[in-house]
Amino acid sequence: MRIPDRELIEQVIEAGRYAPSGGNSQTTHFIVITDAGILSELESLVQAEFAKMETVPGMYPSLRNSVEASKRGNYSFHYRAPVLIVTANQKGYGNALVDSACALENMMVAANALDLGSCWINQLHWLDEDAEVRAFMEKLGVGENETITGGLILGYSADGLPARTPLKRTGNPVTWI
């Protein structure tokens, strides 16, 4: 698996750093993981922690899928991509998720412009209060006063970026006044 050049990764991160933030707070923290051993260790930990969970009626479908795949023992939350960028932000900050979402979207747009594949990854956010995952992420630089807000994987698509037909939007209603 080919890791994108560091310069390309830095360009993607820089796009995230220039995303809007509430009151121009600029508090989104980016943790960039390219070490294959760390990614493998984190993958095993995430699978083990999801496997401990029970599914419940009404559970968010992606979370349910994560739990079920983990119980089967074949779950890679980061799809074995060579780069994982985790975002974190201050606990108690009212715009933590929104600011990080803006940064993640900017990074996805930049990745596309650089012919890199990307995918939004929420699993570490879902496991932010899991003691094992939390301890591991703190060793990687997430602060005790921070909450994990999201993530993004980067890499090269096996067959290049796919040509996509725009999907018809049926949700996200618009109300005009």
Language model feature labels by segment:
Residues 71-72, 142-177:
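C-terminal helix-cap and adjacent tail motif
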Residues 22-25, 76-79, 140-146, 166-167:
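Solvent-exposed alpha-helices and their adjacent loops that cap or buttress functional pockets
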Residues 27-28, 81-84, 148-149:
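Short, surface-exposed beta-edge/turn micro-motifs
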Residues 47-48, 101-104, 168-169:
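Short, solvent-exposed amphipathic alpha-helical segments in soluble enzyme
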Residues 1-78, 176-177:
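N-terminal amphipathic, basic helical "cap/leader" segment at the start of enzyme domains
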Residues 48-49, 137-139:
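Short, hinge-like loop/turn segments at secondary-structure boundaries
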Residues 16, 85, 90-136:
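Small-aliphatic-rich amphipathic alpha-helix that forms the alpha element of a beta-alpha
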